[in-house]
């Protein structure tokens, strides 16, 4: 849980999200320098009852935490090629992320996820979409959009490259 993940922005909009979607719960899995600060923010904003900071969890158990969720949110501006987006999609979650060119080909707004602008208001609006009917629709097909990034999908792409190279070599 580092500064570059920009979770403090998610925490800032969380009280308004909670007003719009009263059953929502904000779970942050992991450890890092911002963990205590996020806990303080939750207390100050009066939302600590709906926030869980799990602390560190072994990588092999992370899928259990994805399985507990409905939406995966990332407000990061610097980790936009992270594996977490694809892991969340493969787990059947609607991904809500701050838009960045690095997400092209991974998340298409309204199709394979929900993209947000940089402001708190834009993130809040995107999260409300993610927790609504649109997010539920996206979650139903999220895994199919993650499939090309799977080990199998990667192997198929590598095989296709080799086959093209072999064919080009044969043609001379």
Spans of features found by a protein language model:
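A conserved mid-protein helix/loop that constitutes part of the nucleotide-sugar donor-binding site
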Residues: 2-16, 26, 33-39
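Nucleotide-activated donor-binding/catalytic signature segment of Leloir-type glycosyltransferases, i.e.
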Residues: 37-57
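Short alpha-helical donor nucleotide-sugar binding micro-motif in glycosyltransferases
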Residues: 56-57, 64-69
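Aromatic "clamp/platform" in nucleotide-sugar-dependent glycosyltransferases that forms part
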Residues: 77
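Short hydrophobic beta-strand element within catalytic cores of glycosyltransferases
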Residues: 94-97
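Conserved acidic donor-binding segment of nucleotide-sugar-dependent glycosyltransferases
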Residues: 109-120, 129-134
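A short, well-ordered alpha-helix in the C-terminal region of glycosyltransferases
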Residues: 136-149, 160
